[in-house]
Amino acid sequence: MKVHKGDTVLVVSGKDKGAKGKVLQAYPERNRVLVEGVNRIKKHTAISTNQRGAKSGGIVTQEAPIHVSNVMVVDSDGKPTRIGYRVDEETGKRVRISKRNGKDIQA
């Protein structure tokens, strides 16, 4: 999967189209990413009491994962781009590059 944890992404489709956020978690086996502030859902949780007596629970708002095809990585220029790979000559490892300008993508 070409989107990694820590990347800044732009949502290109869906109810949050146009929103930018940081990838909090990537789920490559499901092709989904969890983006900060995007796809917020309300989850009903049981009210529980912790050791200090504070209550938590009720209706909690949290982010839900979205499909990786609905986001684009934002490059160093602040514009959305597609991602490609090149092999680094010194280390022999794959490096992600921006298809828009050819620069390396730093996570």
From Swiss-Prot:
Alphabetized GO MF terms: rRNA binding; structural constituent of ribosome
GO cellular component terms, A-Z: ribonucleoprotein complex; ribosome
Transmembrane segments: none
UniProt keyword terms in alphabetical order: Ribonucleoprotein, Ribosomal protein, RNA-binding, rRNA-binding
InterPro entries: KOW (IPR005824), Rib_uL2_dom2 (IPR014722), Ribosomal_uL24 (IPR003256), Ribosomal_uL24_CS (IPR005825), Ribosomal_uL24_KOW (IPR041988), Translation_prot_SH3-like_sf (IPR008991)
Pfam families: KOW, ribosomal_L24
GO biological process: translation
Function (record text): One of two assembly initiator proteins, it binds directly to the 5'-end of the 23S rRNA, where it nucleates assembly of the 50S subunit.
Similarity comment: family membership: Belongs to the universal ribosomal protein uL24 family.
Subunit structure: Part of the 50S ribosomal subunit.
Protein name per Swiss-Prot or TrEMBL: Large ribosomal subunit protein uL24
Species name: Mycobacterium marinum (strain ATCC BAA-535 / M)
